[in-house]
């Protein structure tokens, strides 16, 4: 049963909590149970690559074994929580939208831009269908939508949002691992960590560009820029 359906049946009689996959700290605690923790930078690289699904860190699995487990989780979610529940017939269309969003973690895009791209490669899907698929992927907790916040106008913008994955291993289990994707996956990791800590997270739009994340929790506001390395001439 989806969370929205639970709300319908149990109005006023339940409290919902969003459960995330393992944080980096939790990942290290799991790993200490069966092996020696390596250099922290190497561990972070492994965490980005292997993700934080608890089932993949109960013992020392190979990368291929991890991705097999995660792919099973992905397939179960796609086919049970999305395809079957919503009676989707054109599964190939849904999977193309999934692959596009997974490949474009950290990039701003819209349902229209996805539709335009798929049309350019001879797989036309209308905007409304793409938008519907994105909503269903959100409701199944595979994707998190991150809106843009105009820091000057102090308002949420409704265009060019970003989407982040519930876990970085989802991306690699579906698309395969490539080193050039690490920067955007690191951004995904930071986004999830801010959410775990109870922040409402948006992308900060400025006249000259953007701040990766504006994180708000009551009166506490953080401005976060994510980078793999900081180069300095000092």
Language model segments and positions:
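Short, basic interhelical loop/turn and adjoining N-cap
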Residues: 120-129
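Short acidic, hydrophobic short linear motifs in intrinsically disordered regions
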Residues: 107-118
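Short hinge/gating elements
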Residues: 80-84, 116-121, 170-180
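Interdomain motor-coupling "hinge/lid" segment immediately C-terminal to the ATP-binding subdomain
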Residues: 3-108
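A generic structural signal for residues located within well-ordered alpha-helices
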Residues: 89-92, 125, 185-186
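A cross-kingdom feature that marks ATP-driven nucleic-acid transaction machinery
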Residues: 129-234
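Short, locally clustered residues in the helix-turn-helix/winged-helix DNA-binding domain
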Residues: 99-103, 119, 195
